[in-house]
Amino acid sequence: MGIFGFFNKDKRETLDKGLEKTKTSVFDKLARAVAGKSKVDDDVLDNLEEVLITSDVGVDTTLKIIQRIEERVARDKYVSTSELNGILRDEIAALLAENNSEDQDNWDLPGDHKPYVILVVGVNGVGKTTTIGKLAWQFKQAGKKVYLGAADTFRAAAVEQLCIWGERVGVPVVKQQMGSDPASVAFDTLSSAKANGADVVLIDTAGRLHNKVGLMNELKKIKDVMKKVLPEAPDEVMLVLDGSTGQNAFEQAKQFAAVTQITSLAITKLDGTAKGGVVIGISDQLKVPVKYIGLGEKMEDLQLFNKRQFVDSLFNIEH
């Protein structure tokens, strides 16, 4: 795994533990859906549809999965209920694979320029600043020089929290006083990072989704100002979502996608919820890659998302 700081086995154990509630919920419902049935018929498919929707996979993605299973049943003439788990696993894996982003297996950065700039967006309370802090730690563990920019200048708590993370991880935080222009903070951050040979920059932003026009203009201005320092910036616009909110995360994702172009997703708080199906639905509906998932409180519990490992863990497949 290159310079990734811990072993695959530990990562898989964290993933299994983090998805425990989702797995228990889905497979308990699945067992009830096929109870007393030997073959997959319309009743089983209706029950499966309900299982997926109540597991926060989302209506559109659920209907897509059901249609594919219906086609398979029609083609094979007879499909036993004992085969349903395997078929469902195949279809979920295929859906995630269609979002043809490459899974990263280490914390190396794409591109041949420095620094690599990640603009982080998301509403307050989803774990945005915590995710930035944990990402900073992961990148630092991988030998990267990291800079943080506190461009959420509307909340004193946001700047303060980012500074605490900066101290904890041991990386510089560029900030200005409360109420400053967020674009000015972004400009200063990139200027300092570039001058000091940083490898990666993470910029925190305000999550004021209730004022869409204001947020759209603010993010556009931040991007425009960044380009004055680095024409390629930002390399990534990452939306942080709270996985435990299920369908609310869906709605937030759609609303943010309408405000600015999102290029990657970080889905947090999956360890305390049975709503892990939201990962499948959001990835399918937005056609934006899930890049990171949060599976616990520890620094290393923020993991690079790997589609195959996620499906294998969900269906308890060992390699």
Give short role names for the model-derived ranges.
Residues G2-F4, K9-L15, E20:
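Switch/coupling subdomain of P-loop NTPase systems
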Residues V59-T61, R155, D271, M299:
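Short hydrophobic/aromatic residue motifs in ordered secondary structure
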Residues Q161, D181-N196, H210-H319:
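Conserved catalytic-core segment of NTP-binding enzymes
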Residues D16, E20-A151, A158-M178, A186-K194, ...:
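Primarily NTPase-proximal linker/entry elements flanking Walker-type ATP/GTP-binding cores
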Residues A206-R208:
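Short glycine-rich anion-binding loops that position phosphate/pyrophosphate groups of nucleotides
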Residues R12-D16, G125, T153, L215-L219, ...:
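Short acidic/polar alpha-helix capping motifs at helix-coil junctions
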Residues D42, L63, Y78, S82, ...:
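Non-catalytic, surface-exposed connector residues within folded enzymatic/regulatory domains
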Residues I3, Q104-N106, L135, E251-Q252, ...:
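Short beta-alpha junctions and helix-cap segments that line functional grooves
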